[in-house]
């Protein structure tokens, strides 16, 4: 009997040999004829057939009969015979240990293997991280719900109170580490994402409410260092400026104290009028010397200030010289003749000063020195105004001249005489060969007019011999 459609002959005897004893292996050598194309050869093969349980073989036998029944009666009879042969040669043992004892020694099972086919009970599970997952058992596929879908969805007041407590304790640095976040997540039964989000929102809320007591964490250390360096440099710069201000104040105080001391020394003296601060060069002492502090000249007319502004820029007066200025101005303010007052203003704008030795030119500072008592009125041009600055060593002489001028300035001025003087000032580039100098002289005593006029006429030749160049007044404000 053969099934040519299957490609191999079917013998009446079974090709499967299963030993009756389950302890031995079921590997037997049999002969099998296989037709390959036109030739057929008999080959010997070894088949190993394991033992099966009754419930497995019963189902396979019925399925085999149903499958072979479609081929008609001849095949159905063969299928029935084959099913009977299978049933005869397979042992049906209720003991499952007989199945595993037939395996090779390398697959031996320990004692108690019979419990494998008993009902499977759920073993106790071990959770290494989160104990809250221990109450959830494995599902039918053996997986665990690690997504936290069964955990708390939103934070309650109890959980947020724990987080708020930690935030208050660490308000100087409200950035919890990874371990602290894990600890807080376990305590509050929240996820790490929820804890991190809560702290981020809390920091943003505190920053918006201007309750920030920590330095931003995202700011690099170099930026912090640069900020500190800039603050230190700014403090040092302010310190240097304050030191400079202190030094200037000290210098001004020293200078003012020297001026006051020299003025106090010269007050009680009643020495005769000196001709010059420098004994080598004769200088006229006919014009009174009085300091004109610009700060104390508030009530003066603006044209007088313009005359002062037309003069070259000179040294600023010391702040403490106002006490002497008030003494000088009190005489002018108490004067009842506005004409004399106007003469004094004009004389202050165009005062003629003496020369220094060999090119050293001397011009009074803001003290506005006027040598002697005579008050000239400048006519067309100014002749004899020289450039230069007063030496600090001449402060005492200046104060003495000022005191001498105070003694005669309050006297009533007698009638003046008008004279025209020829002053040869060829050294000044803007002038002609001779300059007209009209002066109105007011003098307290008679008999000095001619001598003082001659002294004034000798001034221009002296200037020309000394080769000193008069400078042009420049407006500086």
UniProtKB/Swiss-Prot annotation:
Q: What is this protein called?
A: Iroquois homeobox protein 6a
| Disordered: annotated segments | 209-282, 303-323
Show the InterPro entries listed in the entry: HD (IPR001356), Homeobox_CS (IPR017970), Homeodomain-like_sf (IPR009057), KN_HD (IPR008422)
Q: Does the keyword Nucleus apply?
A: yes
State whether keyword DNA-binding applies.
Answer: yes
Q: What does this protein do?
A: Transcription factor. Binds to the iroquois binding site (IBS) motif of target genes to regulate gene expression; functions as a transcriptional activator or repressor. In concert with irx5a, plays a role in visual performance.
Compositionally biased intervals (Basic and acidic residues):
219-237, 254-264
Source organism's superkingdom? Eukaryota
Supply the source organism for this entry: Danio rerio
User: Where are stretches of biased composition, namely Low complexity?
Assistant: 310-321
Please give the family membership noted in the entry: Belongs to the TALE/IRO homeobox family.
Q: Name one GO molecular function term.
A: DNA-binding transcription factor activity, RNA polymerase II-specific
User: What GO terms in the biological process aspect are recorded for it?
Assistant: cell development; neuron differentiation; regulation of transcription by RNA polymerase II
Q: PROSITE patterns attached here?
A: HOMEOBOX_1, HOMEOBOX_2
Q: Which Pfam families match?
A: Homeobox_KN
Annotated localization: Nucleus
